Amino acid sequence: MSIVTHRIKEYAALLADAEKTGVGTNPLTSIDPNLSVTEAYHIQLENIQMKVEQGLIIVGKKIGLTSLAMQKLLGVDEPDYGHLLNNMEVANGGTIPIEKVLQPKVEAELAFVLKKDLMGPNITTLDVLQATDYIVPALEIVDSRVKDWKIKLPDTIADNASSGFYVLGDKKAKVDEINLELLGMVLSKNDEIVNTGVGAAALGNPATCVAWLANKLSEFGISLKAGEVILSGALSAAADAKAGDTFSARFAHLGQVSVHF
């Protein structure tokens, strides 16, 4: 085993232990300031592969850091991605036990469900629209296995892009039924509006985010599969969640999606 491979397995184990024990780890970049983005993706894949071997199923992907504000905050110029597993979906209106998360935040976004595979490179926004079966409103519960969210880009990538859970709404729409750029969203916490957003907040168009993902995945020989759920990126800033909170997001033409802690 090479030194790099050993290091990737070691860091993957730190994150896996943090998830198992509920105690956050120190940032990997504080342990290894030279940790690269490519190595971070391999750490993520190491833990995903382990979960698949334990019987979990990859059901989709999530895209993070799609807003310019978040990219500037972490000093990066492109998004990142993580994997969605079958134990991460929560029913619309369902409850997430607070002991299942470490330091959760809630984001509202649009989910794309594909009707055909997409394999980069050179995938365009139009390719994504043509490959999309339907779009559905979603809440993503982001979470970090890193103490106090003290993350740099390699930290969040290694940590499956700070994924936690996700909730899909009930109303499905075809891409020609809505204007993705102008689609408005209102995020409420305990019946008080905490954030508003619009489709253009995600790289100008959420479908552009999905195209980026297809092209990025091709660097690792991975394609987007028909039937997969793709969370296309937050339409506003994330809101902190604690026990007893209820979140709901209302989308123009797409109805409401909610979750309780």
Can you name each region flagged by the protein language model?
Residues 208:
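Glycine-rich, small/acidic residue-mixed loop/short-helix segments
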Residues 217:
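Conserved PLP-enzyme active-site core in the AAT-like
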Residues 2-203, 246, 254-261:
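Catalytic-core "active-site belt" of small-molecule-metabolizing enzymes
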